[in-house]
Amino acid sequence: MADTAAARLNMVESQVRPADVTDVRLHDAMRDLAREQFVPPTKAYLAYADIEVEYAPGRALLKPRDVAKLLQAVRPMPGEQALAIVAPYAAAMLEHLGLTVTRLEEGDLSQPSPGSYDVIVCEGAVGRVPAGWLEVLARGGRLGVIERDGPVGKACVYVRAEDGIGRREAFDATPPVMAGFAAEHGFAFE
């Protein structure tokens, strides 16, 4: 699309705002960031569509609606430390919002380097959240991820409190499950 600024505005107005994303900071970030820079040039025309866009084998950007809802659910604040796991667009949005972002795109994605993060997000679905992600979540920290073990996944927010970790479901989503992160099914009598 020749006029990407208009495409970004249309994306926010037709996909993000109608999906109850009310955080104006997220609207502004999505209007400012060129989403087509996060996908191969051959897929740039899909960057603002209401679909997941594959940017590398087995890796896809979430739908604009879903990434905005996920980020709104984790309530990022300027100055916080964030970890973006296979989430290049979300990482750029978090940086735009004033967070310090560590990106994890390669290696053992289930075991981030030791640290303490206020916000953790992943743009790929997982069958189950790896324990390593929860271990690096700071007290009061929020992890936003889509858990999927079937046709429809649930965007979940995990919050670390003093006495443990809580979980709540935020919305339904259907991104592909990342390679190596499918739910393990055991034997069961039917």
Please place each PLM-identified region on the residue numbering.
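Class I SAM-dependent transferase core
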Residues: 1-105, 163-183, 188-189
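Conserved nucleotide-cofactor-binding alpha/beta core module
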Residues: 71, 75-165, 169
